[in-house]
A protein has these predicted regions:
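The feature captures the LRR N-terminal capping module
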Residues: 1-49, 53, 165-179
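LRR N-terminal entry segment and analogous cap-like coil->beta motifs
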Residues: 21-90, 95, 99-102, 106
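Per-repeat structural element of leucine-rich repeats
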Residues: 67-70, 89-92, 112-116, 133-137, ...
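Intrinsic-disorder/low-complexity detector
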Residues: 73, 121-123
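Per-repeat beta-strand-to-loop junction in leucine-rich repeat
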Residues: 85-86, 107, 128, 150
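Short, conserved loop/helix-junction motifs that constitute active-site signature segments
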Residues: 98, 119-120, 140-142
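Leucine-rich solenoid repeat scaffolds
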Residues: 127-179
Length: 179
């Protein structure tokens, strides 16, 4: 087995996920990747495509302690959702997949920089409970669903004066502040 493929197979340790290289030598993952607070702070090898979703959870407790700190080596394409929860070392979306067929959900991390966001998200972009204060990166992307920035500095600062899009901005209240 190829060394890069073996490295990823050992990391994932999931018999329901198939990892292989395509005819262009790109790493492809068939199946949903689920990572629960392992010692990894990023994927160890570059993945081209995941035919499924990525769920990278920090430790589910009152203390956020997830180990993910970089989206380096994340796939270029994800045919499902990308869900990153409770990873306070993650501060940026640099390395984010370029195209996500489902939703991108980054909740309870420490993301302040979204400039590396995917160019196309077919469903929702949710980045609640992060210190995001600048959303100008959203001007050049396609989001097929809602954008939710609940309990972020940006949402709190703009909840009364924003018009013309569909963003939910107030914690615990689904108030559409754009038309």
């Amino acid at each position: 087995m190829d060394k890069e493929v073996l490295t990823l197979v050992n990391m994932l340790n999931d018999k329901y996920v198939h990892v292989y290289k395509d005819e262009h030598n790109n790493i492809i993952v068939d199946g949903t990747i689920i990572i629960f607070d392992k010692e990894y702070d990023e994927f160890p090898v570059k993945i081209h495509k995941v035919n499924g979703s990525i769920n990278w959870y920090g430790h589910i407790s009152s203390d956020p302690c997830g180990s993910l700190k970089s989206l380096k080596n994340f796939p270029d394409i994800v045919t499902g959702n990308v869900y990153i929860f409770n990873n306070p070392k993650l501060t940026s979306l640099d390395g984010c997949p370029k195209e996500i067929y489902g939703s991108l959900i980054c909740d309870h991390c420490n993301i302040s920089d979204i400039s590396g966001i995917a160019s196309k998200i077919n469903n929702n972009f949710i980045a609640s409970n992060n210190p995001i204060s600048d959303i100008s990166a959203l001007e050049n992307i396609t989001v097929g669903g809602n954008i939710e920035l609940i309990d972020t500095p940006w949402a709190n600062a703009h909840k009364n004066d924003i018009k013309n899009a569909s963003i939910i901005a107030e914690k615990n209240i689904q108030e559409t502040i754009f038309d």
